[in-house]
A protein has these predicted regions:
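Hydrophobic cores of alpha-helical transmembrane segments in multi-pass inner/ER membrane proteins
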Residues: 3-4, 67-84, 142-153, 211-227
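Interfacial helix-loop-helix junctions of multi-pass membrane proteins
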Residues: 46-49, 119-129, 187-209
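Membrane-interface helix-boundary motifs at transmembrane edges
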Residues: 87-98, 157-169
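Alpha-helical transmembrane segments of multi-pass membrane proteins
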Residues: 30-51
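Short, Lys/Arg-rich, polar N-terminal cytosolic tail immediately upstream
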Residues: 1-18
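Short aromatic-rich membrane-water interface segments that cap or initiate transmembrane helices
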Residues: 56-70, 128-142, 199-214
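Alpha-helical transmembrane segments of multi-pass integral membrane proteins
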Residues: 29, 99-107, 164-189
Length: 243
């Protein structure tokens, strides 16, 4: 049973990192980025272009910046853990191995999308094609909502077979992540359409949105590691000093 995760130390021993500690460390990084985002965003709104570079580097709603990189790493980490679970489930001939594998692919795609903002490319074409605005101002949600519903149907039995505490974690993680990625995004579209993005109110809306996404991904990673710790055979990674 996988109970702890081992990493090398300079003295040749090992340090242990459990799911809770990993999630806590990731949460602290996320909280720091959220705080810096608020400071940088308010400085930009009140101080104008003098603080543009600061805001561009740390604003949560920005692109190709530090928070985006961190979010991409979280999604990629989830994808890699899912891939590891899928590999073991495949060896065990588990009936749900394809579900784990598909999830790993989905999260790697999400990580790539987060880094290059691929979904943003759909906003204007969909808005023009369907003539939507308001809560659908960010047009990609028109595609996201039915895709999420289809995945929910496909993964219903998969969720039911999971241990109850893991199922609760996964469901809550999905609610948090999708609540930010789709729910609050729709509300921000209404505000953005009328008021633009350079306001404290919009900063707060997008901060809530991205905070929910951070929380959902980190909780999901915690759930994945907890599942591995309780349900999979032991995996130990050892690193030997070179030379």
């Amino acid at each position: 049973m996988l109970q702890k995760y081992y990493v090398a130390t300079p003295v040749g021993g090992h340090a242990t990192l459990g799911p809770r500690r990993i999630a806590k460390q990731l949460g602290l990084i996320a909280a720091l980025l959220i705080l810096i985002n608020i400071v940088a965003g308010v400085a930009h709104v009140l101080g104008g272009n003098r603080y543009y570079d600061l805001a561009r580097m740390f604003i949560l709603d920005g692109e190709n910046n530090i928070p985006t990189f961190f979010s991409s790493l979280l999604l990629l980490a989830a994808g890699l853990v899912l891939a590891s679970i899928a590999a073991i489930k495949t060896q065990e001939a588990d009936r749900y191995a394809p579900h784990w594998r598909a999830l790993s692919i989905i999260f790697v795609i999400l990580a790539f999308d987060e880094m290059v903002s691929l979904h943003e490319m759909f906003n204007h074409p969909i808005r023009q094609l369907l003539g939507v605005d308001g809560v659908l101002f960010f047009g990609f949600v028109v595609l996201a909502i039915p895709l999420v519903m289809i995945l929910a149907i496909i993964y219903a039995r998969f969720l039911i077979h999971l241990p109850s505490h893991i199922r609760r974690i996964f469901v809550l993680a999905a609610v948090l992540y999708l609540g930010g990625q789709i729910g609050v995004e729709m509300l921000s579209g209404v505000y953005f359409e009328s008021n633009g993005s350079t306001t404290v109110a919009y900063l707060l809306i997008t901060t809530v949105e991205e905070s929910l996404e951070f929380s959902g991904i980190i909780l999901f990673i915690y759930g994945l590691l907890s599942y591995a710790a309780r349900n999979l055979r032991e995996i130990r990674l050892s690193f030997e000093e070179a030379g």
